[in-house]
């Protein structure tokens, strides 16, 4: 934003970038990552395939699933993309042999649906009409996902930080190339169809408002660093104790658990870590 509104010149950006490059060249990826975790800096390594396969974080999270093939070989495959509380995703099975299910498929020529097909009803109502969502996500990945739910008719109230601007508000394009946090094309695209308000969650009064919104909501979405919600007293265990029917999804760079869980970051940093 400082570059866009003229408070800093592009030459200053280039100067700082060169200085950072010189400094980073004296450090290893591991050293930079450890320092970033200690100082809460947005720095992540660009990993190799070997580093991904041997990732301590992915191993801790149980990401790899070992599948035994028909010839007896065992191979690790990427597992489920998320951890579900009550409905875990199905484990991977062995790949079928060529033609293994041909006869079985051919014998099911008159298969009927497991769920009876109802008479088609024409309606202008969107499928998620009536679903109420409290959106505590920020940046791009989370708000883009909840934007899809808004497109399908969900009623969404998005809460932003009252003391720290969402970084996406600083991104181009802007109308007439005039920087304005309320007019970022990317931000408004990600959050179309939602209602919004700003709260300072460090204040008890703001947490009271969040609880009112939780009582209203069917679904809670959040993308803070792990433990942040619990520190505010609004983590899943605390919410579920008062409202056991709540559906909650938490998203962060490295997952909610593990030795690297506290590493913060954006989507481009996830791409770097993924190799």
Give short role names for the model-derived ranges.
Residues 7-11, 78, 94-97:
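Active-site loop of classical SDR/Rossmann-like NAD(P)-dependent oxidoreductases
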Residues 10-13, 81-85, 123-126, 188-190:
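A short alpha-helix capping/helix-coil boundary motif
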Residues 15, 85-88, 216-222:
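Short, surface-exposed connector motifs at secondary-structure boundaries
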Residues 17-27, 43-44, 91, 134-137, ...:
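Short, well-ordered beta-strand elements within core beta-sheets of diverse protein domains
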């Amino acid at each position: 934003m400082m570059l866009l509104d003229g408070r800093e010149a592009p030459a200053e950006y280039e100067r700082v970038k060169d200085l950072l490059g010189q400094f980073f060249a004296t450090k290893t990826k591991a050293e930079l990552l450890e320092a970033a975790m200690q100082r809460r800096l947005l720095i992540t390594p660009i990993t190799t395939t070997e580093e991904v396969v041997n990732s301590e974080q992915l191993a801790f999270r149980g990401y790899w699933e070992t599948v035994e093939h028909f010839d007896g070989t065992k191979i690790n495959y990427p597992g489920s993309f998320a951890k579900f509380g009550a409905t875990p995703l199905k484990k991977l099975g062995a790949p079928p042999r060529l033609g293994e299910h041909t006869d079985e498929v051919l014998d099911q020529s008159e298969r009927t649906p497991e769920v009876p097909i109802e008479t088609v009803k024409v309606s202008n109502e969107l499928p998620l009409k009536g679903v109420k969502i409290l959106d505590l996500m920020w940046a791009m990945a989370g708000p883009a996902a909840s934007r899809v739910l808004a497109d399908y008719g969900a009623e969404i109230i998005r809460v932003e930080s009252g003391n720290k601007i969402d970084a996406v508000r600083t991104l181009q394009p802007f109308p007439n190339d005039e920087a304005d946090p309320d007019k970022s094309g990317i931000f408004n695209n990600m959050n179309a169809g939602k209602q919004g308000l700003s709260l300072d969650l460090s204040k008890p009064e703001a947490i009271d408002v969040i609880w009112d919104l939780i009582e209203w909501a069917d679904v809670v979405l959040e993308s803070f660093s792990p433990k942040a919600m619990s520190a505010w007293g609004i983590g899943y265990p605390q919410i579920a104790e008062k409202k056991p029917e709540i559906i909650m999804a938490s998203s962060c760079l490295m997952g909610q658990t593990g030795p690297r869980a506290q590493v913060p970051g954006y989507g481009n940093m996830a791409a770097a870590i993924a190799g």
